[in-house]
Every structure is written in structure tokens, then in C-alpha cells.
């Protein structure tokens, strides 16, 4: 069985967050601000680390990110399947 996280990747959704954030022409600061309006405090630097796979993401943060990006939660994990193969 393949290892899911090799010690350098701290989450499975970072690349997807970056993809959809950029598609929506949203800056990391804007994403951070929209999350804050929902009561979820993720600073711009943390958004950067999430996208770089160097920060873990809580379930609450993942849910809020999906809401802000207007995508289903499952969509956040679109690239995760390859990690299991």
C-alpha cells in the first residue's frame, strides 16, 4: 500500500484550493478575509502554507473553504485518489 503522506505533504486539498481560488481570480488575502467573515480564522500566510501542502487543514476549515470557493466538499479532494493508488 502506498503511503498517503510522506512527511512533506500535510494535507490532500492544497493544490485544489489553489486551483479554484485562482479560477475565481481570488487572492490569498481575499480567501482569508472571506473565511474570517464566516468565523474561520486562517491568515493569508496560512492559506499559502495550505496551498503549499505544508499546513494541515481542519474539517471546519475545509468545509468553510469549500463554501467560499462555492464547490462541493468532495471536489476539494479531487486529487486525493492518486495518493491511494
Provide a role label for each language-model segment.
Residues 1-24:
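A short, Lys/Arg-rich alpha-helix, primarily the initiator
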Residues 25-49:
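Short alpha-helical DNA-recognition segment
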Residues 16, 27, 58-61, 72:
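Residues that mark the N-terminal boundary/hinge immediately upstream of a DNA-recognition element
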Residues 2-7, 67, 74-85:
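Short, charged recognition helix plus adjacent turn
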Residues 45, 52-64, 83:
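Short, basic-rich loop-to-helix N-cap that marks the start of a DNA-contacting helix
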Residues 22, 36-37, 52, 81:
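Residue-level detection of the helix-turn-helix DNA-binding "recognition helix"
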